[in-house]
Amino acid sequence: MTQQPQAKYRHDYRAPDYQITDIDLTFDLDAEKTVVTAISQAVRHGAPDAPLRLDGEDLTLVSIHVNDAPWTAYKEEEGALIISDLPERFTLRIVNEISPAANTALEGLYQSGDALCTQCEAEGFRHITWYLDRPDVLARFTTKIIADKSKYPFLLSNGNRVAQGELENGRHWVQRQDPFPKPCYLFALVAGDFDVLRDTFTTRSGREVALELYVDRGNLDRAPWAMTSLKNSMKWDETRFGLEYDLDIYMIVAVDFFNMGAMENKGLNIFNSKYVLARTDTATDKDYLDIERVIGHEYFHNWTGNRVTCRDWFQLSLKEGLTVFRDQEFSSDLGSRAVNRISNVRTMRGLQFAEDASPMAHPIRPDKVIEMNNFYTLTVYEKGAEVIRMIHTLLGEENFQKGMQLYFERHDGSAATCDDFVQAMEDASNVDLSHFRRWYSQSGTPIVTVKDDYNPETEQYTLTISQRTPATADQAEKQPLHIPFAIELYDNEGNVIPLQKGGHPVNAVLNVTQAEQTFTFDNVYFQPVPALLCEFSAPVKLEYKWSDQQLTFLMRHARNDFSRWDAAQSLLATYIKLNVARHQQGQPLSLPVHVADAFRAVLLDEKIDPALAAEILTLPSANEIAELFEVIDPIAIAQVREALTRTLAAELADEFLAIYNVNHLDEYRVDHGDIGKRTLRNACLRFLAFGETELANTLVSKQYRDANNMTDALAALSAAVAAQLPCRDTLMQEYDDKWHQDGLVMDKWFILQSTSPAENVLETVRGLLKHRSFSMSNPNRIRSLIGAFAGSNPAAFHAQDGSGYQFLVEMLTDLNSRNPQVASRLIEPLIRLKRYDDKRQEKMRAALEQLKGLENLSGDLYEKITKALA
């Protein structure tokens, strides 16, 4: 490695010495060599002798002019261009060359298939031209694009088209202008040949907005759902948040090569095609809902992210935590609130809690960063959203919306901080959030322990609630947090007991603010069954000694669907933990009859929402189960999970078959009622696949071949792979033959291959690196084959012989120079070595040491490896 990457610290923030108010860009486009001319209007705000330090990577400088005169007072350093002796106000003209075709990191301007496109967040604009590449520099952008008309008939950039023309040699040009000042991370450019779906949306003030969705030629029939989702997002943001769109045009472009999910560039969103393209035979129900959510997320950024942006990248959760909260609310308002909440909580418990316990632990507002791309994390996004949700819980919807309005009044058109947001919420609601602010600075997952006591003579019920946050890799000392802790108490008939104290009603959300607190309730006429941490009111781990009877009671009687699911999760957790210990001692699975009966009751409940029943019947993933243990035994977890599946499949075989048959649908609609029925039916099929082999094989094969939609086809295929049924290989081959030309559809197949429980799965994965549909230059393919193996097949990745680790080292060695961002995502399971036994730790450490010795190790990997080895 040439030099050790340097860390940046939040407390070192300084306002820039120069601001750029306007920038006029011209791109003379060519895949091999693009010429960029940047004309910036700059103003000095710092000391008179302060040089202008511009960021730039992989650029070839052609010329520099200041106020039209050639300028020689400059020097190039690694990653920077430093210009001296500048007047207070000036026009800076820089011409440079870049090569989009050579840009395999997919940051800046790069080639995706036959198109050219950009990705500038977080620090990609410096790969396009020299500039103040930081979010607190907001300029008005005008962009002129010149290109070959036959190769690139569509030339797109932010804002409205203001001019266009034809040139000789078959070239043409377009000029676009974005009237809203923005940081350069929101700049976008796309050039290519597309099919276009056009529509309009009339805002509540009567303005007509042109909507344009650009997809690869031949994919137009997969675009309508994304357009519907966009219009739903625009309407919802007006209705729920009072926020209206502000430009005359909104464009979305779907590209196949993309490091992230999607990008909210002002007026021109660039999307991974995974989150745009859907047709009933290519996309599952989950894909449809993910598209709706991600389209919503990027649209909602127009206000929370673009109109008000981040002062610096340490404040990333200001825009991302808030916008994830908004997209979760959007999905919940349009669909099932309980199912969406369950999905979010699965992510927190299975993935974010693991991040908190890893070497990369950080608060939602990090204090120290080496490579900013490494902080687009579950902590910043999902835990960030939980922190916003807690504010919403403490304030209520009305005060929260007042806080949002005040936030926009104060900060519209500027770059703000997390503190600015909390201050607006506090000022608008008169709720003191001073203690609550600690969530922004303290990392880790708090553990909340609850003990209760009931006195039948005084009819008093007491809860003693204590909290502690274990030390994390980045912080040894922890302080008590302000935890909104929601509860409900039930009597023996399933009625909710009103919470009272001293004759007054008590709010069901308890404010837990100390290391230990006691809450006493009066007039509790019966020993209650408590529902605790209702709706997952805070991102914490809960410890309470439940009896099986309490949990089965809540599964049946809790009035809140989330509480019913959560009780089932707790019941399963009890027996998973017990059986992992039994497995390690060589004993068989033990599952009491009443546990199977509790799940039978769910299947026989005619009033239950099928979508909720499906969630209750979906066992926690291996990653969720892992979080129940200090030291993770991935082999034991996989085997216990399978044994549990087989036991329930045998105990409830008749019920599973009956529910499977009764939920058959003839036609396919993306409708929440139908989605619930399909999800329940396919959850039953999953168990049936682990039952009697002949019946399983017949049912699964028949569903696969009769399916008129991808949801049912993939559910059958997935069941065949998970249960290793005789029909597996034939069905997998049929799928490959049918879809091998469609990368997105093949991603589902690659995931099934790489997460298979088969003994030879690693050998299979290695073979698939040469598959006709696989490419090491496409992030979606890499994530589906290599990422899913390392991250979602722990039993195989953590094989005793270390073969899984060695495989990942080989892949990361290739990706380190090819695409460091993707490499950095894939290394996550390897850096969590301290959660495993000594033998595995030793092998994982050796693998990390091997990577650390790579020549030209990227900053992205360096940061994670050094933290893991510390």
Task: Enumerate the predicted regions with their spans.
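N-terminal, polar/Ser/Thr-rich
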Residues: M1-V35, Y110-Q119, Y131, P135, ...
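Surface-exposed beta-strand/loop patches in extracellular or lumenal glycoproteins
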Residues: T37-D58, W130-D133, A139-D148, D419, ...
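Hydrophobic alpha-helical and helix-loop surface patches within well-folded domains
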Residues: R176, S205-T458, T462-L463
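Short acidic/polar inter-strand loop motif in beta-rich domains
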Residues: I98-A105, P470-A471, F536-L542
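Beta-strand-rich binding/interaction modules
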Residues: T60-N67, F187, D432-H435, T445-L532, ...
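Extended, low-hydrophobicity, Ser/Thr/Pro/Gly-biased non-transmembrane segments
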Residues: V95-R198, D561-R564
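A surface-exposed beta-strand-loop module
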Residues: H45-S112, D133, V512-P528
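Long, ordered, helix-rich scaffold segments
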Residues: G350, D522-A870
